[in-house]
Swiss-Prot record:
Top-rank lineage group of the source organism: Eukaryota
Comp. bias intervals (Polar residues): 459-482
Protein name stated in the entry: Putative uncharacterized protein DDB_G0288537
PANTHER family documented for this protein: PROTEIN SIP5
Cysteines joined through disulfide linkages: none
Region annotation (Disordered) ranges: 159-217, 254-276, 332-414, 459-501, 556-651, 803-846
InterPro entries xref list: Sip5/DA2
Biased composition (Low complexity): 163-217, 355-414, 483-501, 568-642, 811-846
Organism for this UniProt entry: Dictyostelium discoideum
Length: 846
């Protein structure tokens, strides 16, 4: 079964069948704000697509549930980003989104159990659950699910971490390419200066010195060999430097010693180095793509196994041409029919990081052993080869240094050796991972790097015609390998050196090195990178100095031009200068006055704003203080008064809440039934308690001295069976005839026989302060009221709720209208009085 590339734990039960992958149903449950959520790097739709891609590899997606804990959302994101996340999830479609206010994960567990109960008949076909939570590995739900044959995958983070590393590597490569482009642009700018010839010569000399220094570093690194213990019993030979002189071929299509190179200068070699750059083909393949490619090529590559490759290395008889020895591939014998069984994380207790497999340490050791053995083999083969000329060495050093990105060899690279004979055919071996048809498990992501030869002749080209049959179709028998090797090399007498190379296996590779992830750089590679970085820094410093010189020259020219312009202005007539000066002074004075006025206005505005801000702050502080006081008062009211919890569950808050609810029912006179306890317990916990969660609480209560009776559906603590009134089972035998008669007499005297609800009736009865009923507890009063309802003495009518609410605003409106009319009458009277006063004044005047 495929393992998620960024999963922390993968629990598998049962056999590894492809039917489960096709017919099985998958449920995804993501605790949103209990996992790292890098919104700045990835979008929500990208993360959801990653999870769906992983779930599709396990089976058919039946349910996708996301639970959002709003209490943790405030610590993770702002309200605006939370709304954006919520909107993107709703636009994605097909996702159940739930918002909760508690972080106890009870909602998540209940949703998982609901999914299992709905799809429990699919366990035989395969039922898989993906749990995304930072504490997913410690979830108590893992054990009961695996015991029932249900598969579960736990993901600590929904985002793959290796993508970040690939992006960082790509960014580094892009930065290096940009630096190279900037260097070329700076060189072109320097050519425009007066000292173009001198600068170009200095740059070429510096580049030659740097290239020689880099080649000297490569030679020192090739002389170093570090031997470490390999994961496999046999030694694996591997070349650390694919650009060394051992790979300089003298074939028809691969000749390093060109005819024109002997007559060229060092500068021409540097300028033409781009045409002879190394060809590096890097293919990054993820596990689903690689497995799909494997299934398509099973018919063509079914017979290619490591046993046939090893027999090819032992049975074939290559022929030496007398000039140089040949390099062949020899691959160790590995058995792919019986892969090791996967480890169970439940039994072993080991967890691996998203980028580290259990065999990563051993593979790192094997890669180190590859490098040391390859150096020893190459040193022994160089003693049998003729010494190259000085021109070939210089050309090889310049070819290595001319590449734009000089990077150390990767641990997952396969050096494809070319024939040194008379033919120019290229015969790369196919990847062993594509030829294995017996392994059922999918492959983890790996980086396969094919390093081709660094140089070719100008007339040679890589076409399908030049490739050997190995590149187009894989051979099925060792005889075809032998025929290929005999056809590619001319017939001549064999030597003891070629046989020893084949028997010892000069270049051998293992399947595990192809499947392992990228290893960290070795000390040799780090040294080489440091030297290359120092050289690049030196080049940048030189270019910066040249740029500074150019800037200084430009500044001098500008100063000279300004000086000439100033002299011309001074040569003007004195009257014009005086007029211009006066005008400028007047303008400056006006501008200063305007600026002062604007500053005064701004200061006044700032003062007003500061005063308003201070007032608002004082108001906010007062409001916050009032809110805090109200919250404290509410908290004190909600806290149970003088309740001492037993010592056996002091640390368990749920059991404490259950104990307080039972004690409260005891004081109110209610019988502690499931129906009465469940809503009150939810109010105490501040959440809605589901039935499945309540059953778990009951299981814990059994182990902490709570007596639970499923026949009567009651809960008591130890032997404190205080009884209590049950409104759902109201009976007359629980009360005396005098108490019942007192309530009936009250109803008959008041003539109130219809109530909106039982709650309103209970409140009305308690407010009457009857002598016998006032001595009863609240639960008993509720049961007594229920008896009158059952005996049809009193009836309930919910329509009264609507009438009481609608009549109140009508009465208010009538009162308002009356008040308005009275005000109008008063105004009219005032107007009349004013008119009378005016008439009296007029008469007096007459």
């Amino acid at each position: 079964m495929m393992k998620h590339p960024f999963s922390n734990n993968h629990i598998i039960n049962g056999n590894n069948n492809n039917n489960n992958l096709i017919n099985g149903k998958v449920g995804i449950f993501w605790n949103l704000f209990e996992t790292p959520l890098p919104i700045q790097q990835y979008s929500i739709s990208h993360i959801l697509n990653q999870l769906k891609f992983y779930a599709n590899s396990l089976g058919y997606i039946k349910q996708f549930t996301i639970i959002s804990d709003i209490s943790n959302a405030g610590n993770s994101v702002t309200p605006s980003t939370y709304n954006i996340i919520k909107q993107e999830i709703s636009q994605f479609g097909g996702i159940q989104y739930f918002e909760i206010f508690q972080s106890d994960r009870s909602e998540l567990v209940s949703k998982i159990w609901e999914f299992i109960f709905d799809n429990y008949h699919e366990v035989s076909n395969g039922l898989h659950i993906i749990l995304v939570d930072r504490f997913a590995n410690d979830s108590p739900i893992i054990k009961p699910l695996t015991m029932r044959g249900i598969k579960i995958s736990t993901l600590v983070s929904p985002v793959p971490t290796f993508h970040n590393q690939n992006q960082n590597n790509n960014n580094q490569n892009n930065n290096q390419n940009n630096n190279n482009n900037n260097n070329n642009n700076n060189n072109n700018n320097n050519n425009n200066n007066n000292n173009n010839n001198n600068n170009s010569q200095n740059n070429n000399n510096n580049q030659n010195n740097n290239n020689n220094h880099i080649n000297h570093i490569n030679q020192n690194i090739n002389n170093v060999s570090n031997e470490t213990h390999s994961f496999f019993s046999e030694n694996i030979n591997y070349s650390l430097n694919p650009y060394s002189d051992d790979l300089s071929y003298n074939g028809n299509g691969c000749n390093l010693n060109g005819n024109n190179n002997n007559n060229n200068n060092n500068n021409n070699n540097n300028n033409n180095s781009n045409s002879n750059s190394n060809i590096v083909i890097v293919t990054q393949m993820s596990s689903p793509i690689l497995s799909h490619h494997n299934q398509n090529n099973q018919n063509n590559l079914s017979g290619l196994h490591f046993n046939s490759l090893s027999s090819y290395g032992n049975n074939s008889n290559p022929i030496n041409n007398g000039q140089q020895s040949q390099i062949h591939h020899n691959i160790n014998k590995l058995n792919l029919n019986n892969p090791p069984p996967p480890s169970n994380p439940l039994t072993s207790g080991l967890s691996y990081s998203p980028l580290q497999s259990p065999n990563s340490q051993s593979l790192a050791n094997s890669s180190a052993n590859i490098s040391s053995n390859a150096l020893n083999q190459s040193s022994s083969s160089q003693q049998q080869q003729p010494q190259s000329t000085s021109q070939q060495q210089q050309q090889q050093h310049k070819m290595n240094s001319s590449s734009g990105n000089i990077s150390p060899p990767l641990p997952l690279s396969i050096s494809l050796g070319l024939c040194r004979g008379g033919s120019s055919n290229i015969s790369p071996l196919p990847s062993p991972s594509l030829s294995s048809s017996s392994s059922g498990s999918a492959l983890s992501p790996a980086t396969l790097t094919l390093i081709m030869p660094s140089t070719f002749q100008s007339g040679s080209s890589i076409t399908p015609k030049n490739l050997s049959p190995l590149s187009s179709s894989a051979p099925n028998t060792p005889k075809q390998f032998a025929s290929l090797s005999s056809s590619s090399s001319p017939s001549s007498s064999t030597s003891s050196s070629s046989n020893s190379l084949l028997n010892n296996g000069v270049l051998s590779h293992s399947l595990s090195s192809l499947l392992s992830l990228s290893q960290p750089p070795t000390q040799q590679q780090q040294i080489q990178q440091l030297h290359i970085q120092q050289l690049q820094q030196q080049q940048q410093q030189q270019q910066q100095q040249q740029q500074q010189q150019q800037q200084q020259q430009q500044q001098q020219q500008q100063q000279q031009q300004q000086h000439h312009h100033h002299q011309q202005q001074q040569q003007q007539s004195p009257p014009q200068n005086q007029k211009n000066n006066q005008q400028n002074q007047n303008q400056n004075q006006n501008q200063n006055q305007n600026q002062n006025q604007n500053q005064n206005q701004n200061q006044n505005q700032n003062q007003n704003q500061n005063q308003n801000q201070n007032q608002n702050q004082n108001q906010n502080q007062n409001q916050n203080q009032n809110q805090n006081q109200n919250q404290q008062n509410q908290h004190q009211q909600n806290q149970p008064n003088n309740i001492k919890f037993p010592s056996n569950f002091n640390d368990n808050t749920t059991l404490q809440n259950l104990y307080t609810v039972i004690q409260g029912l005891k004081e109110d006179g209610f019988k502690p039934t499931f129906k009465v306890i469940l809503p009150r317990l939810g109010a105490m916990m501040g959440m809605r308690v589901h039935r499945s969660h309540f059953e778990k609480i009951l299981e814990k209560a059994k182990t902490h001295s709570f007596n639970i009776d499923y026949t009567t559906k009651t809960i008591y603590y130890k032997d404190d069976n205080f009884g209590g009134a049950d409104p759902h089972k109201a009976e007359k035998c629980h009360f005396t005839e005098e108490e019942i008669q007192e309530l009936v007499d009250l109803i008959e005297t008041t003539q109130i026989k219809v109530f909106p609800s039982r709650y309103n009736m209970v409140m009305w009865v308690t407010s009457q302060n009857l002598p016998l009923i006032s001595k009863l507890k609240q639960g008993q009063i509720v049961e007594l009221c229920q008896i009158t309802i059952n005996e049809n003495i009193v009836s309930l009518d919910e329509n009264l709720k609507k009438t009481t609410t609608t009549t109140e605003p009508q009465n208010n409106n009538n009162n308002n209208n009356n008040n308005n009319n009275n005000n109008n009458n008063n105004n009219n009277n005032n107007n009349n009085n004013n008119n009378n006063n005016n008439n009296n004044n007029n008469n007096k005047n007459k």
